[in-house]
């Protein structure tokens, strides 16, 4: 019998986009599937909208608001699949994503091989999705994957992964103590527990950049900064458990330097710990530098003013792009239908 795949979808205040995400899940060409939606205490109509899809293979649960990790764990505990596909409630799967990954995994003997796939980001129009290849888009060993992620500041979007139940049970549940980068920590742990990553170029993920993504913005939240720091230490621990070498130490220091601006200078406690850890790894962290357009503000108005200005204009640029795409999306869809465009032809879109 062919393996059963469980598509686990955590959702919080997702009524605007969950229809398209569920359509992409239902449209999967792999027939042996179940879809588990976990409404994490939404205050909008997320649960009501999701229940329109309820069927023998689509089950919707509602829970108190406990966060992403708890919602995913709730879904995994109740699913029956041999493989688990996590899908955020505003992202889309290409129709044959799961089928292509399972075809690739059927050619290997171990259930500890982890499947990944290409991903790209879009705002409203999927045909304008940008797929930007990086060095993670290939077959890699666990240590090579973590080295590149941490040493080159790369990542793979959550839905790219297809995880066997055996591998998920070995890696353990999502960490419910983390409030930021809980997905990054979890999949780093899954990678460490795996016997390798099989990259499947035919399957695609469409990652929506929307207002809901602002939940992942760390800002000035000390809870999120504490969580990020814990996740970073775990990343370093996972990589060093696989290999202790000069290249690993260098990648770990680079990784800390990448995220250093989130703590400097407002969290001197974390800054001091990071410097101590960098010294242990035979490295040193330097004060963050700004883009040349903002660096001149630092000696005149101070570090915080430069940081605030850079963050403001970066956010403004992204907001203007999103609003423009929204306007074009409304213009293109208004003459035909008020129903969101079907996602079944995503495979043909670039």
Predicted regions and their residues:
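Active-site activation/catalytic loop segments of kinase-like enzymes and analogous catalytic loops
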Residues: 124, 261-268
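Conserved positions within tetratricopeptide repeat
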Residues: 229, 249, 253, 268-275
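Membrane-interface aromatic/basic loop that binds lipid-linked glycans or pyrophosphate carriers
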Residues: 268-350
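Nucleotide-sugar donor-binding/catalytic module of glycosyltransferases
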Residues: 1-233, 237, 338-346
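Helix-capping and short linker residues that terminate individual alpha-solenoid repeat units
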Residues: 30, 240, 283-284
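Amphipathic alpha-helical repeat scaffolds of TPR domains
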Residues: 250-262
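Flexible helix-coil transition and linker loops at the boundaries of alpha-helical arrays
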Residues: 240-249
């Amino acid at each position: 019998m062919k393996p059963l795949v469980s598509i686990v979808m955590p959702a919080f205040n997702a009524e605007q986009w969950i229809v398209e995400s569920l359509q992409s899940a239902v449209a999967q060409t792999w027939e042996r599937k179940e879809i588990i939606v976990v409404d994490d205490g939404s205050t909008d109509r997320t649960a009501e909208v999701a229940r329109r899809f309820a069927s023998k293979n689509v089950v919707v649960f509602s829970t108190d608001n406990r966060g992403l990790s708890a919602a995913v764990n709730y879904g995994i505990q109740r699913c029956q699949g041999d493989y688990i596909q996590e899908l955020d409630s505003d992202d889309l799967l290409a129709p044959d994503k799961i089928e292509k990954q399972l075809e690739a995994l059927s050619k290997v003997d171990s259930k500890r091989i982890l499947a990944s796939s290409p991903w790209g980001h879009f705002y409203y129009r999927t045909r304008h999705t940008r797929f930007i290849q990086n060095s993670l888009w290939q077959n890699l060993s666990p240590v090579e994957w973590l080295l590149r992620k941490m040493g080159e500041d790369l990542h793979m979007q959550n839905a790219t992964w297809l995880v066997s139940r055996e591998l998920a049970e070995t890696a353990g549940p999502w960490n419910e103590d983390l409030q930021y980068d809980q997905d990054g920590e979890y999949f780093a742990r899954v990678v460490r527990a795996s016997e390798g990553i099989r990259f499947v170029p035919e399957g695609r993920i469409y990652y929506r950049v929307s207002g809901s993504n602002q939940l992942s913005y760390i800002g000035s939240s000390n809870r999120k900064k504490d969580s990020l720091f814990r996740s970073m230490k775990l990343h370093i621990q996972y990589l060093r458990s696989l290999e202790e070498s000069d290249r690993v130490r260098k990648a770990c220091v680079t990784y800390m330097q990448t995220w250093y601006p989130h703590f400097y200078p407002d969290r001197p406690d974390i800054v001091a710990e990071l410097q101590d850890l960098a010294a242990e790894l035979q490295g040193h962290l330097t004060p963050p530098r700004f883009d040349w357009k903002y660096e001149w503000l630092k000696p005149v108005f101070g570090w915080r003013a430069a940081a605030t200005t850079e963050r403001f204009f970066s956010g403004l640029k992204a907001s203007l792009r999103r609003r423009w795409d929204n306007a074009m999306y409304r213009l293109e869809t208004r003459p035909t239908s008020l129903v969101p465009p079907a996602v079944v032809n995503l495979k043909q879109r670039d």
